[in-house]
UniProtKB/Swiss-Prot annotation:
The organism's taxonomic lineage, starting at the top: Eukaryota, Viridiplantae, Streptophyta, Embryophyta, Tracheophyta
Upregulating conditions: Induced by wounding, feeding with herbivorous insects, infection with the fungal pathogen Botrytis cinerea and infection with the bacterial pathogen Pseudomonas syringae pv tomato DC3000.
Location relative to the cell: Nucleus
Protein name, entry field: Transcription factor MTB3
Region (Disordered): 290-331
Amino acid sequence: MAEKFFLKGEDKVNMEGVLGSEAVEFFSWSASNHMLTEFTSSRGDLGVQQALCKIVEGSDWTYAIYWQVAKSKSGKSALIWGDGHCRETKIGQGEGANDSAHQKMMDGNKKKMVLQKIHTCFGGSEDDNIAAKLESVSDVEVFYLTSMYYIFPFDKPSSPSQSFNSARSIWGSDLKGCLEHFQSRSYLAKLARFETLVFVPLKSGVVELGSVKSIPEDQNLIQMVKTSVVVSNPPQPKANTKIFGRELSLGGAKSGPISINFSPKVEEELSFASDSYEVQAALGSSQVYGNSSNGYRSDEGEGKLYKEELDERKPRKRGRKPANGREEALNHVEAERQRREKLNQRFYALRAVVPNISKMDKASLLGDAIAYITDLQARIRVLDAEKEMVGDKQKQQVILEIDFHQRQDDAVVRVGCPLNAHPVSRVLKTFQEHQVVAQESNVSLTENGELVHMFSIRAPGPAAEDLKEKLTAASRFALKTRWSVSVIRLLCFARLFVYEHQCLAGKFALYFVDYTI
């Protein structure tokens, strides 16, 4: 299959012109790794066609796709095309309205050629070649038909698999955010002018809805999709399949909306049980993708997926039962699968706690997580530094030296503290810079409970104004100057404790406090 999709020269240019470089790269990877060969689904009607048609018709939705869970022989799981329905597009919708008729015909032929190329590369037959039976192909139809050959493995990040693994719906009504979640289909979605994208997880798959209109989030619609889209079990093959609204068995084609119940043919046929579409959700916590400004946010989905049924389907080794009831890997492939699933679960958990995610791939997620952790570490260092500064200030405030000296008729209390810890330290430093000596200093208590520290200084007339400005800037308190005497009132809100000392001569009131600087 890889050799069939080898492109060169003009073929590659035409493919990239219609699909975009990311989609071409995806199909090259899928073909080289035989993805559609490894993951196959049961043929026939899944029983969701009528429900998908009901959701799209009579509403603003353009298409609906059901991605079903499939498993490979190696035990890997992926979401592959299950069924779909697309509304019939009007002429010119999703295309340039001013293009000439000849240009539209040339573009239409190029689109049909690209679709036929994809169909042939992935093992399709001429009988079910949809593009060959169409008269014209719109951009919406190109997007829809190309999606048939897409696959979303659980070990690679993608919006459909992320919605299924987290059991939460994704609703996007922002054009930029929609293109981000379309990922490799973003070029096709941009040409089709889709503005709304929704992923709704179910028990056995994911329903994708798209619209060319901006549709606000509606929880009732999500619940309706969960209850109406029910997969038949087991699926029964359908005799006459309608593809793109036309009967493939006979030539009598009639126009109508696109209703595809089709699985691309592959070179190898793998058989799986039809009831093996249930995979344990990788994460159960709430998760936000992007921010609320771009229209994207996750919602509660079906949280419980049946792990017990999965465990019953796992093959077991014969012989002695493992100790403590622990399940052992059957072989290296099974061990590798379990390791990948565990790694993916941790990536989903990491994505849930990182607030800003630039892209959906693992490398970008790790880069965003590293940047987020580095920012948190810087914040911690700043907070620790502020905490130390606050602690140092508190220590300085409590370091006081109190000396009591008794005299004959009174007593003197001397309270000493470091200069930097004193409220008037800036004022005193300003005095020292200007070589000003305080002639008198006293402390008094006002009726309002304010402690007033007053200084009487003497300075020359011209220097008084300069000193006044610097003292105002240093202490941020009012300064009043009268003749050559400046009185600085420093209001310090504090409590004045009056102590009484019992001695032989009687009680003495401590009325004077002298600060030692």
